[in-house]
Amino acid sequence: WLSFGALIAIIFILPIFKNLPAQSLWASVSVNLFLLPILMYSFYEFPIYGVFLNLIVIPLLSVLMAAGLIGTMISLFWEHAGEAIFLCCRIIFRVYEHSCEAALRLPFARVVTGQPDIWKILFYYVFLFAAVLLLRKKEENKGEKRSGKKRGFLSVLLVGIGMTILLFTAQVKDKITITMLDVGQGDGLVIRGPEGKTYFMDGGSSDVKKVGEYRIEPYLLSQGIGSLDYVFVSHGDQDHISGIKELVQRQKTGVTIKRLVFPTQTVWDDALKELAEMAEKEGI
């Protein structure tokens, strides 16, 4: 979906910016405008600095694909020469990796939105396509300056309305929600308080691998929870802390934890001591 979406954006949206300088920037803007709902629906968040990262990714992509294709063909006849060309691909992948890691270290790098409803996505695309059609009409009537400015303003307004619908989530006040997560043989309790605070109690499993990364974290992000105010640990059994350990290890890329609450230190076992040390290293 991401590849098809990027292609549609370049074909359908980018031409309206053809007379503007810095075409790489506008290509990135076009792609991000179209992919925004897809990213939110699939990953429950979007990267603020994605527009600028694409200024690195898009120009190098053609080099990467060409080097990969040429390297594959040459390696059929001359393996060492093919490996030398593949080195270029590895360098580009390293550039991508380090650029993304650097962007993640910047403030507000990720905006956790949760998974939007389908109707919100449809409304967003209706407003986006309407804005693009208006701007295309503006290109066809270049002589009508006043009319063109009105269409430009209206197009920006339409995209803004679409984004507002897509991003807006009504918060239900004076209500407590409690969700029991299916983590196999284990526990995982998510609580949202009436004041908007989020709590998580005993997240772990003894029979599901990487339960934190693949079950607990995706659920939290899908609900728009990018940060947990309190995480409570009752004791150190695997089916109570294995997922919490993963969340602690993924503080830079996953759900952040503000406070980790342990039982009294007199009942700590080795597992709880290890978790406490791990949390301290991550600044929790």
Provide a role label for each language-model segment:
Residues 2-16, 122-126, 130, 134:
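Alpha-helical hydrophobic membrane-insertion segments
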Residues 4-108:
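Alpha-helical transmembrane segments of multi-pass integral membrane proteins
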Residues 54, 65, 73-284:
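Non-globular, low-confidence helical/coil segments that flank catalytic cores
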